[in-house]
From Swiss-Prot:
Function: Dimethylates a single guanine residue at position 26 of nuclear- and mitochondrial-encoded tRNAs using S-adenosyl-L-methionine as donor of the methyl groups. Also has tRNA strand annealing and dissociation activity independently of its tRNA guanine-dimethyltransferase activity.
Protein EC: 2.1.1.216
Keyword presence, tRNA-binding: yes
Top-level lineage group: Eukaryota
GO terms for MF: RNA folding chaperone; tRNA (guanine(26)-N2)-dimethyltransferase activity; tRNA binding
Gene behind this protein: trm1
Organism: Schizosaccharomyces pombe (strain 972 / ATCC 24843)
This protein's name: tRNA (guanine(26)-N(2))-dimethyltransferase
Family: Belongs to the class I-like SAM-binding methyltransferase superfamily. Trm1 family.
Length: 548
């Protein structure tokens, strides 16, 4: 089933790419359709479109819907509470007060106070797409999201703004989408606390826009942010660039994709903290060749105090790949009831050399150490995604699969390891994943997969037990010792005897639920040279602008 689903999805994306390429090459007027939007074009330089990113846009529509519905309920509840106070002050009858006693009753029975139209007006919201290009994303938001009052589709290039205006008029959403020419940072700085949703989808890093975005978004507003600079965020070739852009140094590791997401979240949190604002990650994903996060901004300075304890360093062994987290702060109950004491954390969690293999550690971070996702938000998104029309949302099955993976991740366990990689340290064949997971579960530890990598494992088991599991496995599945260098990390680990009792008895819950549900969980590369596209016509557009 998994292979069939992946084949169908790959074929669909490949067809979309081929169709688009053929249309571009024909020289005649053509159009592309994605979701509810239609983008006409007659010149390939007019449009910057990557069909592989349809998943990004489908997912974003789903996420904003989940956020807006939750927001609407809170706004209606507050409105109801105000009506109750007014009713009490006006000495209305007890019958009316009882009738409107709860938000549920208010929504169902108090249409004389707040009908559906006025409720929608109360819960309406604004969106800024700061780097709009063709306006495709803004048009989809206007046509597919309820209660959107206004969308500002901004771009710096004159030709891009003209294209946005043409596409907006073609899709009949000019009453909602307003094309705008301007610098993204300037637009956000001129409108502090103004936009309820800000979408940043730059070509490369979003770092230059974070400071303005955390100020421009409204209280409890939503930031939807993409970064495609994976070589910086997820590699080890540019740790100095990662540090200057995101405030933390990157490491070469098997968990590099989650590391990248946590670097981005840390950068957003650090930017917001300067203005007395805190972040609440709702959904944070490593997807294909980019990273996409949905973060709610909380205007509560008291929450900013938690950032120290939510930040961490990571110690990563250069030999065996084991790792340990070092929080930068800690919290404890204060002297008075309901208060919290904030203090520095103690450390380090490791010695200079790895206790398992003797190799040195490399240090990465700081990074975000809190949860990547919000459980209630994921539940809401999954419910919405189930009802999506697959004809409109072509990546529906993958959305469901990605959300299922995120939902089952251990929320309090940063980072993962890859079973085949740690087995390669010992020159051992890998045990079946369900058998390895069963051994961890039988010992009382918690285990999950990760959305970021297909064969990743997250667990609260200590590394000493992980190596004991593999040493016990090797007893029945011997390795060729002549293939292991005596100075290697693997030799040092195998020299030790297991100290824990390991039970490999199979457990049904060792199969992750997301796999059983049969969703499309991990995307295979559907086309050649798959990844972020170059900016077509950038030089032509720049030349046109210079001549105008």
């Amino acid at each position: 089933m998994y292979e069939a689903n992946m084949l169908r999805l790959s074929q669909r994306i490949s067809n979309a790419v081929n169709h688009f390429s053929t249309a571009m090459m024909s020289g005649a007027s053509a159009s592309l359709t994605e979701g509810s939007a239609i983008i006409p074009f007659s010149n390939p330089n007019e449009v910057f479109y990557n069909p592989v990113q349809q998943f990004n846009r489908d997912l974003s529509v789903t996420a904003i819907r989940a956020w807006s519905e939750t927001r609407s309920k809170k706004i209606v509840a507050k409105s109801h509470h105000r009506h109750q106070l007014l009713d009490q002050n006006s000495e209305l009858s007890q019958e009316n007060l009882t009738k409107c006693d709860t938000t549920h009753d208010f929504e169902k029975n108090c249409s004389e106070k707040t009908d559906s139209t006025s409720a929608d007006n109360i819960a309406g919201f604004t969106i800024l797409e700061a780097l709009s290009a063709t306006g495709l994303r803004s048009i989809r938001y206007a046509k597919e999201l309820p209660n959107v009052k206004r969308i500002l589709a901004n771009d710096l290039l004159e030709n891009a703004v003209k294209t946005i205006e043409k596409n907006v008029n073609y899709n009949n959403v000019s009453d909602i989408v307003i094309p705008n020419k301007g610098d993204a940072n300037a637009v956000m700085h001129m409108n502090k606390f103004h936009y309820d949703v800000i979408d940043l989808d730059p070509y490369g890093s979003a770092a230059p826009f974070l400071d303005a975005a955390v100020q421009s978004v409204s209280k409890d507003g939503l930031l939807c942010i993409t970064c495609t600079d994976s070589a910086v965020l997820a590699g080890n070739a540019y740790p100095e660039k990662c540090f200057s852009n995101y405030g933390g140094s990157s490491l070469r590791s098997n968990f590099c994709h989650e590391q990248a997401v946590r670097h981005l979240l840390y950068a957003i949190a650090a930017s917001a903290a300067k203005y007395g604002r805190a972040i609440k990650p709702l959904l944070s994903l490593s997807i294909d060749f980019y990273f996409r996060v949905f973060v709610q901004i909380k205007a509560k300075p008291v929450l900013v105090k938690n950032l120290q304890s939510q930040s961490l360093l990571i110690y990563h062994c250069s030999g065996c790949g084991s790792f340990a987290e070092q929080p930068l702060g800690k919290t404890s109950p204060g002297r008075l009831p309901g208060t919290t004491k904030f203090s520095n954390a103690s450390g380090p969690p490791v010695s200079a050399n790895c206790e398992h293999c003797g190799y040195v550690h490399h240090v990465g971070g700081p990074l975000w150490g809190g949860p990547l996702h919000d459980a209630e938000f994921l539940k809401k998104m999954r419910a919405i995604a189930e009802d999506l029309d697959p004809e409109v949302y072509g990546t529906k099955r993958r959305i469901l699969g990605m959300l299922a993976l995120a939902d089952e991740e251990l929320p309090d366990v940063p980072f993962y390891f890859v079973l085949s990689q740690i087995c390669s340290v010992l020159r051992s064949q890998s045990p079946p994943q369900n058998i390895f997971v069963s051994a961890l579960l039988n010992a009382g530890y918690r285990v999950s997969g990760s959305h970021a990598k297909s064969n990743a494992i997250k667990t609260n088991a200590p590394w000493s037990f992980v190596w004991d599991v593999l040493r016990s496995w090797i007893k029945d599945h011997p390795v060729k010792l002549e293939n292991i260098s005596k100075t290697s990390a693997g030799a040092a680990i195998l020299e030790k005897t297991p100290t824990a009792e390991v039970d490999f008895t199979f457990r049904p819950d060792s199969e992750f639920a997301s796999k059983k549900e049969g969703y499309t969980r991990y995307q295979m590369n559907p086309t050649e040279n798959w990844g972020p596209k170059s900016k077509p016509g950038k030089r032509t557009i720049a030349e046109v602008d210079s001549k105008s």
